[in-house]
Every structure is written in structure tokens, then in C-alpha cells.
Amino acid sequence: MKYLVLIGDGMSDLPLKELKGKTPLEAAKTPNMDYLAQNGVCGWVNNVPQSLPPGSDVASMSIFGYDPAKYYTGRGPLEAASLGVKLAKDDVAFRCNLVTVKGGIMKDFTAGHIKTSEARKVMQELDKRLGRKGIKFYPGLSYRHLLVVSSAVVSGAVKTVPPHDITGKKIHKYLPKSDILLELMNESEVILHEMKTKATMIWPWGQGKLPSMPSFKKKYGLTGAVITAVDLLKGMGKTLGLEVINVPGATGYLDTNYIGKAKYALKALKKHDIVFVHVEAPDEAGHEGSIPKKIRAIEDFDKLVVGTVVRGLGSLGARILVLPDHPTPIKYMTHTREAVPFVAWQANDKCQITNVKCWSYNEKELKKSKVRIKHGHELMKKFIGGKI
């Protein structure tokens, strides 16, 4: 048996008055996910333990089948793995955003979705002028970068806040309680002002040390691959011993190469037992608070990823799991910890046993289902074991 996991990041949402009480997922045209819902098993899964924040790092770890309460150490070390940065035992890795702050307010946690080519020059200049023993900057993709600091310089216990959680808010309440980090942030403002870039400062967050996790092959007996534009998921894949496949034109935004991701996934499925395909666009639209963009991202995910995969499977008896990692409601413009809707479907299996018939894939319709997975990391075992 082959397995595909299709992740629409932040896809689920709340009813909106602008959509006459519908969610973006409900308002979007999603014939392919609807087909899976009609012929598969629908349910709800909670990917975020109560003890942890509702980040993509925590929720994605659950989707991969690992208990975040046991293995999660922070986002930074996973992104370090993606960039090929080897952490020493005492290193603390921070995700380092390039952000736009004006008048003391977090205007844009993406710095206008700064181009990677421009961002690379910015990060190289920051490392040249601010980097020193125990402090190193690494360029990533667009606004997403890495800062590695020795624990002798900054404690991993320092409290930080994701910049996407404070869009439109004054930043002074959310600054890290660390003299070194504040110094780096303040000095970055001077450098970025000189460079005349959309980014006005750096924002370090999501810190942690290297996690110790068994490989996916060891835990589940399957070989696998990950397809994503996001360093976090690439790092997760590398940490778990999965092949990370880079797709040309994958941007982590609405202009990503959806079809390319689907086609590369089908090709990878010939080599591996399981392939994870992650699409960031719905989450980005949620953070922007844009209803039209979120609907467009969901429809593109359905048509170009889900549809391409389902049509391309042919006679291959693969199982498909479709789900978000967490909600990113338009109303809040950030992640929340509520359960998310999922559908599991098997190719060439006309009608699977389920407790209730769902006619479409959205939050309202799936409320009919009594299938509930309380601990998200348990879903993977049920999925590959044919228990759902």
C-alpha cells in the first residue's frame, strides 16, 4: 500500500458574516475534496496538545505521527535542519523573521513577502556586522531565516512571541526579555534602514535545541518523502530521515507551483511508501486576514494538488489523507488550537465503511461525523493501519 498526506496549512476557519455565515472552506469550490468526503472516512483531529502553543511546528509533528508533548523542543532547530545547519549541543536555534515595524506597530511579519534574493543580501550583511562568536545568522527563504546563538550567550528559556501573532499590535509588550536579542534587534533596524529594504528589523522567535526523534522508517516501517516550500517542514522531514524533494517554483505563497508539487508527489510515490505534500498558501492568506485570498488558496489546493493527485493515481491502490494542521481564522489572523477536519480515502475502493455520509469537505458538513481523534499523533498509526 502507498500513502499520501496532503496538508492545506491553516485551511480550516470560522463562519464569517462576509460569507453569510460560511467558512472559507465552505464557500470555496472544492469538488475533489468533496468527492473524497463522499467516498471516504471523515472526522476531526486535534493536533495541538493543551500544554503547547498552536504553531505549525507542533501541529505538523502530530501529523507526522510524533507526540509533540514528548518530542517538541522548538521550531528553530527544525528549520536549522532544513538549512543543513548542524547544531552543537549547547546551541539555541531561533527562527528569525524579517519584519516591517512602523510607529512601534507590527505592520507585516513577512516584510512584504520580501524576495529571497534581496533577503539573502540582508541576512549576509546582518551576519557580517552583527555576527560574532556564539552568534550566527543564516539566510533562508523570503522572510524566514535562522539565528543560532550559544546558550552561553542567550538562554533557550527566554520567552519569545511569533510575529504573526501580533500583527497590528504595538510590539513593546512582546519583545524578548533578553539584552542580547534586544541589542541585535535594535542594531538590525539601523542596518536595514541603511539598506532601504521593506524589512525594518529582525524578529527572533521559536527557539529550541536539537530534538532527539526516531526516524519515520524506524517508527512506522515506511520510507517516505516531504514536498514543501517551508523550511520548518523540510527540517521535520530531514530530522525524521525522509527525503526532502524541492519543487521548482514552490514559493510558500499563493503563487506556488501547485501542480508541480502534485506531479512530484506522484513520481516520489513510485519510490517511497508515503509522501507528505504541504501547501502554505491558505495559512498565509489567513494571517493576512484576506477572505478572497484564502478561498483562492483553498480552491487551488483542491483543483491543482488534490485533483491532480487523485487523477494521477491510476490503478495504484493508494490511501490519501487530507487535512489542515491547525485553523488560521481570518477573524484572528493567527493560529488557534481547535480540532481540524480530515478525510481519509482509498483509491479503487468505491465506498468505504463510515459512521455517517458526508457530502462535502468543510467544517459544517463534517460536524455530522462522530470520528474524533483526541491526540493528533495517533492519526498516522490509524491511517497507515487502515483503522480509518
Please name every model-derived segment:
Residues 1-388:
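Feature captures the catalytic ectodomains and active-site-proximal regions of enzymes
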